[in-house]
């Protein structure tokens, strides 16, 4: 009788802990009141040696890629935890259950992993403060960008030296069209003012600034993001630049692959639906919409806080001289 009771007790504990862990990590839609200032931890008390990775997920076609990306991040010792924010409300529960199990099973590192089913598809949700985040730095990234571990760790080292700046590997710029007399979204060859959320590292404070401060003005700009279904990254750059009066920092990466870039040709993409799932795959319309966002944010704020930065921080410059080897011009230090 005692043995049977003990077996039942062990089985009960297994079920409770297994199911509790699964439900918590898969159904949690965020803190009930993310803007409760009493729950905000003091910056100095947060961990400075690691970063929390927050990945935005939506497309079911990208789930295999998402699993690979999570596994890659989890393998780095600087990653404290990984939060996958799932914003597609139509995804079946069974598929999300399987996704969560795969994330746990195939991620080799010690980082804790949570799959958080969002209550809405609002892009603003990726910047909500979360009480579970215990690091000073957070990395906001997409589900279609792979970056190597050394580049991740280098970006973190750059951020630690510049904790008030936005740091990233993908950049764009604002500009003023003299002919049209309006602000536009563009790319400049020698300067930039916007870091994209493909890979954006920042201090946790900016989540609270974006989601909870700024009064009616900030609320109106978040509504613009919802209406356009775009531009949350541009608005975060507005927030950081307005507070800091400085532009972002671009860092170089040894190997980074953007599977959602529309310039991927079909032969290079395992499934073209992986490439086409993103909003930004429709390039011309995408750029026009983002230009409109910049103009709308400028209208609401009554000023243009975005500031230009120049150059890129790289891990090493290496050999710059070219030599002819095997009939090809290559850097001289290459075999």
Locations of regions flagged by a protein language model:
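Short, acidic, metal-binding catalytic loop of nucleotide-sugar glycosyltransferases
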Residues: 68-81
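Short, charged/polar "capping" segments at the starts of alpha-helices
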Residues: 61-64, 89-99, 176-177
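Conserved donor nucleotide-binding strand/loop of the catalytic core
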Residues: 105-121
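Active-site acidic Asp-centered loop
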Residues: 87, 134, 141-143
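C-terminal catalytic/acceptor-binding lobe
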Residues: 2-37, 44-52, 61-71, 213-335
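Short beta-strand/loop segment that forms part of the nucleotide-sugar
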Residues: 55, 78-94, 116
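Conserved catalytic core of nucleotide-sugar-dependent glycosyltransferases
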Residues: 130, 141, 145-225, 229, ...
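Active-site nucleotide-sugar/metal-binding loop of Leloir-type enzymes
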Residues: 118, 127-137
């Amino acid at each position: 009788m005692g043995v049977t009771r003990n077996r039942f007790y062990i089985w009960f504990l297994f079920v409770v802990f297994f199911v509790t862990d699964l439900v918590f990590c898969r159904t949690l839609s965020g803190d009930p009141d993310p803007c409760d200032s009493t729950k905000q931890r003091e910056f100095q008390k947060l961990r400075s040696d690691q970063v929390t990775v927050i990945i935005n997920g939506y497309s079911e076609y990208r789930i295999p890629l998402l699993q690979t990306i999570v596994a890659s991040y989890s393998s780095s010792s600087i990653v404290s935890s990984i939060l996958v924010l799932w914003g597609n409300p139509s995804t079946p529960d069974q598929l999300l259950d399987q996704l969560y199990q795969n994330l746990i099973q195939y991620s080799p590192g010690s980082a804790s992993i949570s799959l958080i089913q969002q209550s809405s598809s609002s892009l603003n949700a990726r910047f909500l403060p979360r009480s579970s985040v215990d690091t000073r730095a957070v990395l906001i990234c997409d589900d279609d960008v792979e970056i190597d571990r050394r580049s991740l760790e280098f970006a973190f080292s750059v951020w630690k030296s510049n904790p008030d700046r936005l740091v990233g590997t993908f950049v764009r710029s604002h500009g003023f069209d003299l002919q049209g007399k309006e602000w536009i979204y563009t790319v400049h060859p020698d300067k930039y003012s916007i870091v994209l959320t493909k890979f954006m590292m920042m201090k946790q404070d900016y989540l609270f600034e974006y989601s909870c401060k700024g009064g009616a003005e900030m609320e109106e700009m978040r509504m613009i993001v919802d209406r356009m279904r775009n531009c949350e990254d541009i608005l975060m750059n507005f927030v950081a630049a307005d507070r800091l009066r400085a532009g972002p920092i671009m860092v170089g990466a040894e190997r980074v692959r953007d599977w959602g870039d529309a310039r991927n040709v079909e032969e290079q993409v395992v499934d073209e639906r992986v490439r086409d799932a993103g909003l930004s795959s429709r390039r011309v319309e995408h750029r026009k919409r983002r230009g409109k966002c910049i103009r709308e944010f400028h209208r609401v704020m009554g000023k243009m806080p975005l500031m230009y930065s120049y150059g890129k921080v790289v891990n090493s410059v290496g050999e710059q001289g070219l030599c002819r080897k095997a009939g090809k011009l290559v850097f001289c230090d290459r075999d």
